[in-house]
């Protein structure tokens, strides 16, 4: 990056791809604002149906510590635009502007065909996986666009292979990830002449807690069963996604 002291914001930063991305950015010299759910919000955690256990404040502190002195934990829910705006304001007030945003917050729920999917599953998958990306993009992009020319900000959303093909019994999750791909395509067109870019990564089966939840939803013994279905013959390591 052109700036001497670049700044990155990562959502879903407590575990998995988000934590790996934060650590990678810190190793490259970025000051990293790690955003994930607060420890003191068990009610919000229990709203997500199914076996997935979202990360919380303790995980977030550990992920920030893994970034050395460059990681700073910020407790916020990506479903809450006001909370995200407050974090972004804090980051800008301390560091001036934002260079990179990684929207990695996500969750998986389902395990039933579409016609048996209840409203809570649908709403939670759209709110977390799609609206969460919209919320952090809307909160952070004005700062990136206000940077003096030549701008070179980067917005990266973590979508899924489900953005390219539907996953049975995960209609809501698949719809949300297709939505992320569409959102980023539109955003990329809007940013075309700004110097700021927007991209999405669409990983397949990655060794994270979300894959454990997916295995449970499909009645698999553990996530290793997905390795047999992977084209590369194994699960993807989160750090491999963070390195892209």
Q: Where in this protein do the model-derived segments appear?
A:
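Residue(s) in the substrate-gating loop at a strand-loop-helix junction
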Residues: 160
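Substrate-binding pocket helix/loop in short-chain dehydrogenase/reductase
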Residues: 112-114, 121-126, 226
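Alpha-helical segment proximal to the catalytic Tyr-Lys
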Residues: 142, 189-193
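Short, flexible catalytic-loop segment of classical short-chain dehydrogenase/reductase
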Residues: 203-213, 238
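C-terminal helical subdomain
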Residues: 200, 220-244
């Amino acid at each position: 990056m052109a700036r001497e002291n670049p700044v990155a914001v990562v959502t879903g930063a407590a575990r998995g791809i988000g934590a790996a991305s934060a650590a990678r950015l810190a190793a490259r010299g970025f000051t990293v604002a790690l955003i994930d759910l607060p420890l003191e919000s068990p009610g919000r955690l229990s709203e997500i149906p199914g076996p997935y256990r979202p990360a919380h404040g303790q995980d977030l502190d550990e992920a920030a510590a893994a970034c050395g002195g460059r990681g700073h934990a910020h407790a916020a829910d990506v479903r809450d635009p006001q909370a995200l705006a407050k974090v972004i304001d804090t980051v800008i007030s301390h560091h001036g502007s934002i260079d990179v945003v990684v929207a990695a917050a996500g969750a998986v729920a389902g395990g039933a065909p579409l016609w048996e999917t209840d409203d809570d599953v649908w709403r939670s998958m759209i709110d977390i996986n799609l609206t969460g990306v919209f919320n952090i993009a809307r909160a952070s992009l004005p700062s990136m666009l206000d940077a003096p020319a030549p701008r070179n900000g980067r917005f990266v959303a973590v979508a899924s292979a489900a953005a390219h093909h539907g996953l049975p019994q995960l209609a809501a999750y698949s719809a949300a990830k297709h939505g992320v791909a569409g959102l980023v395509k539109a955003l990329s067109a809007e940013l075309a002449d700004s110097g700021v870019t927007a991209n999405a990564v669409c990983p397949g089966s990655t060794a994270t807690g979300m894959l454990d939840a997916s295995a449970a939803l499909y009645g698999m013994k553990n996530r290793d069963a997905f390795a047999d279905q992977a084209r590369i013959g194994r699960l993807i390591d989160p750090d491999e996604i963070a390195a892209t």
